[in-house]
Structure formats: C-alpha cells, structure tokens
Amino acid sequence: MKRTIILMLDSLGIGASADAVRFGDEGANTLGHIAQACVTGNADNGRKGPLTLPNLTRLGLAHACAASCGEFPAGLDASVTPIAAYGYARELSSGKDTPSGHWEMAGAPVLFDWGYFTDKQNSFPPELLDALVAQGNLPGYLGNCHASGTEILDRLGEEHMRSGKPIFYTSADSVFQIACHEETYGLDKLYELCKLARQLLEPYNIGRVIARPFVGSKAGEFKRTGNRHDYAVEPPMPTLLDRMKAAGGDVISIGKIADIYACCGITQQHKATGLDELWDMTLAQVKTAADQSIIFTNFVDFDSSYGHRRDVAGYAAALEYFDSRLPELLALLLPGDRVVLTADHGCDPIWTGTDHTREHVPVIFYGDTVQPQDLGMRDTFADIGQTIAAYHGLPVLDYGSNCLPEHH
C-alpha cells in the first residue's frame, strides 16, 4: 500500500528567505513570531501561555524552523528527537502567492511574473469594468479598490444589497475578487459573473478570480460563507497531480486544493469549511482511500482567518487545535502510508500590512518507510513533489530533487 497524505498548513512560514528583502519581508518568521508572542503573554486572547505543539514538534516542525532561521521557536521543546524526516525549502517562484507555492510544491514553479492591480483606488482598467457591466448585464459595480474582505463588506454591503451592484476589489496578490450577498444576489449568479471575469482577465495575467459570497442584513453583521470559489489559471506545466491521475491513481482534494490547481489532476473533490471540518474530511478519506492515492488538504484558515488579519492569538490557537488532531491521523496510517507537512508561503501575524511574507516552508515526511533525518535546506518546494513522485513510481517531474532517494 502506498498512499501520501499532504497537509498544507496554508501560510505557516518558518523564517525569511534570502530574497525576502526584495519583498520587504526581511526578518519575517510566521511560526517563530507566534511562538515568541505566546511566551511573552502577547497571545493570551482565548488561549494562554507558551505555544503547545507536542505532535508537530515530534514530527520536526520546531527543528525545521530552527534550521531555517537559526533560532529554536520560543517555548517549544528542543529536547525532543524528531520521528520524521524534516527540513525547510526556499521558493524558486517569483511570487509569494498561493498558486505559486502550491504549484511549485507539485513540480511546476511560477517563473513568470503575475499581473497585479497596483493602484489602491480605481484599481481596475475602465475597459475591463465596462466589459463586465455590458456582458454581465450589471447595474454597475462597487469598490474598484484594494480592500480587506471583511472591511469592504461593512462599508459597501448594504449598498450592494440595495442596488444589486457587485463589489469588485483586489489586494497585493494577483487576484480579482467579487463579493455578493448569497441570498439577495444569488450564489449561481455570482459564480457566473466570476467565470465571465476569468475570461475577460486573460490578457491581464491575473492568477485568480475569487467569488466571495456573504450573508447578513447590515453592516457589522455581514459574514463570508464557506461557498467561496476560486477560478485559477491552469498550472504552467503538468504537476505531480496530473502524473498521478494519468497513472490511474487517485488525487483526492479536500478544501481549496481543486480550485488552486484549476481542477487539473484531481480525481475527487470534497468541500469542507473550517479546521474541524477539514480534519474530519481528511480522516474520513484516509479511512477509505485506495492504494496509489494522494489525499491533499489545504488548511486555509491559518492564512485567511489569522495571518492576513494579523491575529496572533487566533493563529496560535488554530495551530494548537491542528496539533491536537494529528494523533487521530497517525493512528489511521497503514504500512506504506506517508504524511507530508508543508506550507505555501508565510503570513506573519506580527508583520506590517496584511500581505503574505516571503519565507521558507517546512518540509516534513513521516511514515514507516521514512528514516528520521535532517533534510537540510531544499532549493525549491518542488523537492516535495519529486519525492512523492519517486515514491509512487511516477515519471520524473521537470523540477525538484528527491529528498529521500534511498527510500522506496
């Protein structure tokens, strides 16, 4: 039996990479700064004391962080001997966005520059907006600016409900986001509008169009729902997932994974919202997945609910919850199963602004076929995909080196 379970801890960076200075991220360290805040009592909102991650520490997360940034995360147990192969990887891709991190991990780094809408106000070209209004039969639009997704709902949600005008906004990422009320505007109508935007954005090289449905009746009460949908461009070359699917194996997407890869190489999709549901669905799939399967879960909340919102205590509590569920997974593993833990970028909750941070990510392999060892620094996230491809006997990927060449 050979199955690989990939747990993508979205935004759990473990120290700034050498090129972080290019991004204004020199000194960022998502895990390190959360641990530090916990030890100094600056993350006691709803939780208390030092960061408690016994299972992740046994798997080598803290050791990988120490190797990456030169300092063991405050409050975590440095006396533990890791039971997994652990290391850290730097990013080859030119950006620090979600698709770049995910695609590179699966063997397809993004070596081109995405398009961005850099103007904070009147962010979108008039000809794009005119085409959306005309082809989407819209009464107009709201927003047309950079904004945080929660703040813009408080500002424009009520007007959107009255007027039926969708809210268009962007961020420092290569995204075009559309927020509409699930009930007054309608989910299907929002999805159709996003598909139109995806087509019209082709010449602008924008990575993702994101549907941001919400509910509620007035400012201060609006809440985004779990029906978010991402419309991504396809990866620039075949990925690990395409290789597995082509070989007749299963690629089981949980949460955002299918959206991020534009459904390329996915054989099964399972929706789940929130860390608890994502964990429940992951465990359910591990119980039933066949030989030659990849079960791939994106734990988005670390990034969307805590990293971008710069909520240190929330991020710490979420990590502790994640850690508390790990033993359930380890208890289900069969001989030949491997667990991979990694991240797609950083999003340091003590950093300025609300953007991602350019960081190293953890590279952790665990299973009965994996010799515990220090994997050191990996030159690209693609080493993860190459290692998984080799284990499953798939064709070699264009990028990356096998971290565990002697293990098959």
Swiss-Prot record:
State the name under which the record lists this protein.
Phosphopentomutase
Kindly list the GO molecular function terms attached to this UniProt entry.
magnesium ion binding; manganese ion binding; phosphopentomutase activity
Q: Subcellular localization, per the record?
A: Cytoplasm
* Cysteine disulfide partners in this protein: none
- Which HAMAP family does this one have? Phosphopentomut (MF_00740)
Q: Which organism is it from?
A: Tolumonas auensis (strain DSM 9187 / NBRC 110442 / TA 4)
- Its transmembrane ranges are none
Note accompanying the cofactor annotation = Binds 2 manganese ions.
| PANTHER family found in the cross-reference section | PHOSPHOPENTOMUTASE (PTHR21110:SF0)
Pfam families found in the cross-reference section? Metalloenzyme
In the UniProt record, does the keyword Cytoplasm occur? Answer: yes
GO biological process terms, semicolon-separated: 2-deoxyribose 1-phosphate catabolic process; 5-phosphoribose 1-diphosphate biosynthetic process; metabolic compound salvage; nucleotide metabolic process
**Keywords from the UniProt entry:** Cytoplasm, Isomerase, Manganese, Metal-binding
Query: One cellular component GO annotation, for this chain's record?
Result: cytosol
Q: Where does Mn(2+) 1 bind?
A: 10, 344-345
Q: Please, which domain of life does this record's source organism belong to? A: Bacteria
Requisite cofactors: Mn(2+)
Q: Which reaction does it catalyse?
A: 2-deoxy-alpha-D-ribose 1-phosphate = 2-deoxy-D-ribose 5-phosphate; alpha-D-ribose 1-phosphate = D-ribose 5-phosphate
- Which SUPFAM superfamilies does the entry mention? Alkaline phosphatase-like, DeoB insert domain-like
The pathway this protein participates in, as annotated, is:
Carbohydrate degradation; 2-deoxy-D-ribose 1-phosphate degradation; D-glyceraldehyde 3-phosphate and acetaldehyde from 2-deoxy-alpha-D-ribose 1-phosphate: step 1/2
Q: What is its EC number?
A: 5.4.2.7
Binding-site positions, Mn(2+) 2:
303, 308, 356
